[in-house]
């Protein structure tokens, strides 16, 4: 299946059902932190819910609508987060999302993983645009979007719906042409 070697430390591995146990443990370790930014993380992680997510993501992968990867170290042996791309093949665009275990935050791993996936979106999938959507309050994610070269396009009032609240959504975008021009 799909695997993307980012560098000598990081590999993005397509999430498969055999990864459900490890993914569930990783989500549980980070649940309270993730639930602040991700509506899906408000529900307790279970192996069955993780398996269901992986099955749906694999079906979407086969249809060309999603690439859901695990950020892994040690040649794929240690799972530390997730980086994915939802694809709209008709529009030629994608939506990137990511999260990482708190223990690995601040080391540039998420930036490198996201950079590799956006590069693949343009060079391998021939997408024309990649969007990044996050809470306006999520300063780390917004900072990452800007470091990657995405442009802030505006906010969607109450665009992120949680069980007991809504957050305004910040939208960032980069086109294939902009991405190529910004690469060394």
PLM features: what roles do these ranges have?
Residues 52-56, 116-119:
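Generic recognition of well-ordered alpha-helical segments
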Residues 56-58, 159:
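Short, P/G- and charge-enriched loop/turn segments at secondary-structure junctions
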Residues 1-22, 26-33, 68-184:
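Acyl-donor (CoA/ACP) binding surface of acyl/acetyltransferases
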